[in-house]
Amino acid sequence: MAAPAILNGGDATERETRMAHSAMTLVQVINGGYHVVTKVALNVGVNQLVFCVFRDLLALSILAPLAFFRERTIRPPMNRSIFFSLFFLGLAGIFGNQLLFLMGLSYTNPTYAAAIQPSIPVFTFLLAVLMGTEKVNLLKVEGQTKVGGTLVCVSGAIAMALFRGPALFGGKDAADSVKSVIIDRSQPELNGWLVSSFLGLGFDQWHIGVLCLIGNCMCMAAFLAVQAPVLKKYPAYLSVAAYSYFFGASIMITTAILFVREPKDWSLTQSEVLAVIFAGVFASALNYGLLTWSNKILGAALVSLYNPLQPATSAFLSTIFLGSPIYLGSVLGGILIICGLYMVTWASYREQQTTSAGNEIASSSDVRISEPFIYRDETGK
């Protein structure tokens, strides 16, 4: 089903809506390129924590001045609730999201890392139900479709985790020949302890990477689920992104100081510096700024809907630049994830359109059709 692209009234114009859709397309294209760039950096042997620290500091140095000068007149006062919400956004959306992604990517490949990202919208829906911000009526078709789509999507994620299958395209994964080098030489004690713990339980490195990527998706889902109501109370989107990066970078720096033992790990080669610049400027500052603004305009339902663009972009780029193969398990699991995703979003939009039609009759035609499905107050506005 095609997602509604126009908001009838509300606080966003049709031009802003079109710009937000274009922005989210750009975000996912950049994310696909980021998967390839970071895989190359990991293969060279850059320390994951050090990479994240430099990336976050660079992004914060861009977002903080922009937020300070552009939103000084519209930034609401800070309170305890907003403070802790922003801290959580930094913990989940910056620290957990980035670190788990890099750990997962180092043990899999860019195609696989991108193929599992479409599970983010369904994880967002599950968290919204647990938080009580999304209701499911199992007596209606929409509610049944939501539950069915969630199960289909989770089944796809499980299939990707348990079934790798033969390579459909490409040859031997370039990452296989360097994994041991990456693990032995480059990664901090935090990573080594985590990996050794899972290896002791019978997991291999591929499945450890898959678990890290699932954790990465859940962190991003939590980030979107919490960010939507925060933007209602604190509509300065650049400030929300900057504060999130401030808290996330602070946690990342503290973790790096504790677990990065080798001074040489803090020195970067020229190619690693270029990877950090791409990650900090484009995949962090630009992407998170656009994502936060689009979340304010479109809502998390539509923002999450753009994640399925990542697998195609990443697969295309990684096959060209890395020679990474595309596995049967990734294809089958990705198909299930995307099918489940569209089942959930179709049911959500059906419910929203029904609610909007009722509100138009009861009040006026100035009603938001594309209301975020992870946030709903008592009045339904």
Swiss-Prot record:
The keyword Transmembrane helix applies. GO terms for cellular component: membrane. The chain crosses the membrane at residues 26-46, 49-69, 82-102, 112-132, 151-171, 206-226, 240-260, 273-293, 297-317, 320-340. Its main location: membrane. Pfam families: EamA (PF00892). It is found in: Membrane. It is a multi-pass membrane protein. InterPro entries: EamA_dom, WAT1-related. Signal peptide: none annotated. Residues 31-143, 225-345 form the EamA domain. Keywords: Membrane, Repeat, Transmembrane, Transmembrane helix. One of its GO terms (molecular function) is transmembrane transporter activity. PANTHER family: WAT1-RELATED PROTEIN (PTHR31218). Belongs to the drug/metabolite transporter (DMT) superfamily. Plant drug/metabolite exporter (P-DME) (TC 2.A.7.4) family. This is WAT1-related protein At5g45370. It comes from Arabidopsis thaliana.
